[in-house]
Each structure stands twice: as C-alpha cells, then as structure tokens.
Amino acid sequence: MDRTEAQTRADIIDQQLALSGWNVKDPTQVIEEFDILTALTEGVAEPRTPYQGHQFSDYVLLGKNGKPLAVIEAKKTLRDAALGREQAKQYCYNIQKQLGSELPFCFYTNGLETFFWDLENAPPRKVVGFPTRDDLERFAYIRRNRKPLTQEFISTSIAGRDYQIRAIRSVLEGIEQKKRDFLLVMATGTGKTRTCIAMVDALMRAGHAEKVLFLVDRIALREQALAAFKEYMPNEPRWPNVGEKLIATDRRV
C-alpha cells in the first residue's frame, strides 16, 4: 500500500510509539513538527518567507525534564528510510546548538524499517520499534557517565594470560572505534569463559554495559558459566538461580 508520509505517521509510526509508551498527543512527551531555528543563508539579512531560517523535525521525544532525548525523521513507506538519515542528523546537531543541550539520539524510519543512531558513538543500526522514555534516559545516562575503554583496567585475576589480555584489549579498543561486531576464536582449554567474564567485568566497570546476555547451547555449559560468574563477579546478580524458569529482569547477567 502506497501511504503518504502523513498516513505513514498516523497509521504506523504513531502506533509504534504508543507501543513503547509514548503519547504523541501529549506535548510533554512528544512534539510533532518541532521548530528548529537555523542561521539564514550568508548574504540574506531578513527571511523572505515565514519558514526561512526554520527546520521542522517530524517528531522530537522529550525526557522527563522536558529536554529533547531523540529526533525521529519519517518517510512514507515506499521510500527508503535511509533518505532521512542526513536530515535527522542535521536536526539533532541543530537542536543541540539551539538549546545548548545534550545531543539527541537519532532515528529515521519509513514505518517498515527503523534505524537508531547514537551519532558520535556508534554507526546506525536497524531496530525493531522505538525505546521507551526510561530506556532512552538510561542510554543518555550511560553515554554521559561511561569511561574510555582504551585505558580500562583488565582484571588479570580473572583472565591473566597474555593472549587473553590481548583479545580483551582488542575488543575494548574496537568498541572505542565504534565497531559493534567481534569474533574471538579460541581453542578448548584456553579459557574462553574467563576471557568473556573479564571482558564483561571491564565493560561494566567502565559503564559501557548495564546487562549482559551470556548465551550457551547446552545446560551443562550454562551451569559452568554460572559457577564461573559467581566466582569471579560475585556481587553481580545472575539469572537463573536453581529452579528459576521465568526471566528475571533485575539481574545483570
């Protein structure tokens, strides 16, 4: 179905925002057609039209303090969502400049595909839906308070072999370079689990990770991993404990 941009917003994007707890009719949460003041073209002293020197963001999501958390640029369903990428980026930087606030997070979507961009920290990535207000505020808190990973201490009491330290350091440096995907190939007996735990420990201490999913393909490996996390990161709550089947959202591992 060929929807216009207005139909795409009303029929799809508004509903997706509602699923994440955003009320597009509440101006304390969402502002549509957010007015962004921009400089006039060089040599133009006065605006020739009421809209010259203005940009209008399709949506701006607000934090509980009323400041912009995120910008959403919408395109109609039959257009490539990526066509809104640079436009959304420009809006984010102009809002930051206009308000003197933190740089908003960036979204661009056609209703069928949505991309999230933490502009100065990671490349855009495809997501399913929009984060809640609490999620975005948590992302902003992490971004504001995390420490550089290049100098982060690696606990050699967890993984102290030279090749383990090199592997962890390589991943930490890659994250600082805005990379998102890493593959470590390690033979049996080389300390894969302890290498992962030391990496998780460094990421959590630096404020780059709040929760970690450690995925295994056999129950026996799950028990081994749980025991290892209990030994080397005893203060971090883990799931599952004995007999637990329902996922507990208050655990960090």
What are the language-model segments listed below?
Residues M1-K211, V216-E236, T249-V253:
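ATP-dependent helicase/translocase motor core
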Residues N241-T249:
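Short acidic low-complexity segments
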